[in-house]
Amino acid sequence: MAILKWKLSRWHTSDQISTTETADPKTTEATNNESTQGTKRRRLDLPDSRDNTQYSTKYTDCAVDSRPRGGGLHSTTNCTYKGRNVCSSKVSPIVHLKGDPNSLKCLRYRLKPFKDLYCNMSSTWHWTSDDKGDKVGIVTVTYTTETQRQLFLNTVKIPPTVQISTGVMSL
């Protein structure tokens, strides 16, 4: 305490230093408007990071994300996918590649030169409710057409340790 008094006395006179009283917290306009307990203060000079309306998605040309929101699945008479009775107007053919997660990661990097043969490729993921205990990784690949999917499967060499499942996805 004596060192603090000595340091402060070098810049201030002794009547400005109070050793027995505590200082009142100073408030600013920003702290008066918002509760500071448990919340972050918003920076006014930056745009709101939660507002995604200014960014356009790069997936607009893909069949998976081009379906308008709010509509449910409906039956169509000209549905090309015979595996289901109910088809959406916008479905995307997919392939699930299943196997060891590290092998799938390496396969994803090996498939980058073939990106014109697919629309989107997911990161390696797995089902969390799997009771078996083995962590089989899954990579989902989407296509714009079934022809593109077939061309991908005919062109790309998939390792024999990776299981291939085909299907469709609608959002």
Curated annotation (Swiss-Prot):
Q: Which GO terms describe its biological process?
A: regulation of DNA replication
Q: Name one GO cellular component term.
A: host cell nucleus
Q: Where does it primarily localize?
A: host cell
Q: Name one Pfam family in it.
A: PPV_E2_C
Region Disordered: start and end of each range?
15-54
- InterPro entries recorded for this chain? E2/EBNA1_C_sf, Nucleotide-bd_a/b_plait_sf, Papillomavirus_E2_C
**Keywords for this entry?**
Host nucleus
Polar residues composition-biased segments: 28-38
A GO molecular function annotation here is:
DNA-binding transcription factor activity
Location in the cell reads: Host nucleus
Determine if Lipid biosynthesis is one of this entry's keywords: no
Q: What does this protein do?
A: Plays a role in limiting the replication of viral DNA in keratinocytes. Recruits the host NCoR/SMRT complex to viral replication foci to mediate repression of both viral replication and transcription.
Q: Which family does it belong to?
A: Belongs to the papillomaviridae E8^E2C protein family.
Name of the protein described by the UniProt record: Protein E8^E2C
